[in-house]
Amino acid sequence: MSAESRKFEFSPENMERAKAHVAKYPEGRQASAVLALLDLAQRQNGGWVSRQAMTHIAGLLGMAEIRAYEVATFYTMVNLEPVGKYLIQLCRTTTCWLCGSDELRDVCADVLGIGVGESTADGMFTLIEVECLGACVNAPMAQINDDFYEDLSAARLKEILAMLRRGEQPPTGSQSGRQTSAPASGATTLLDSGSA
């Protein structure tokens, strides 16, 4: 039986979560919870949403199946095909590209043996390119599952991939040690505490 043909239902725990999402909306507006339920289904289903999951969600929300499908196919964060345990999303927008995202893509090709849109044979990693992830000041960056890895170098990405393969959780955020989106060169203004 293919993954696509399996019936989908929320687990008891996720059904409770789904009900909590739906309860946030007024009567007659339950369909507004569709994106939250698609995310919940994706997390339960190993990182992707099947047509059966969309049908299940549409039934729960009392909406036409096509409406759930429209939402799922509109948002790029909804994966419509199986992905690896670690979904690597490389930012390819101008800032990340200028700061070296091509080298990060090359690391994935060399270390994992996959190109963009491919998964490793063991199902561990999937690589995709995405548009702006919203951390341009910390370019180049990648999102792996729900975590941001910013200020990435090719060498650091190799280390992160090795850690993930060993089952370790690499530290998230800036990989160069800077705080949030502070200037890469350090503070340049308001250095004199007596000024103001």
Named regions from a protein language model:
Residues 1-196:
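Signature of N-terminal electron-transfer/Fe-S-associated modules in redox systems
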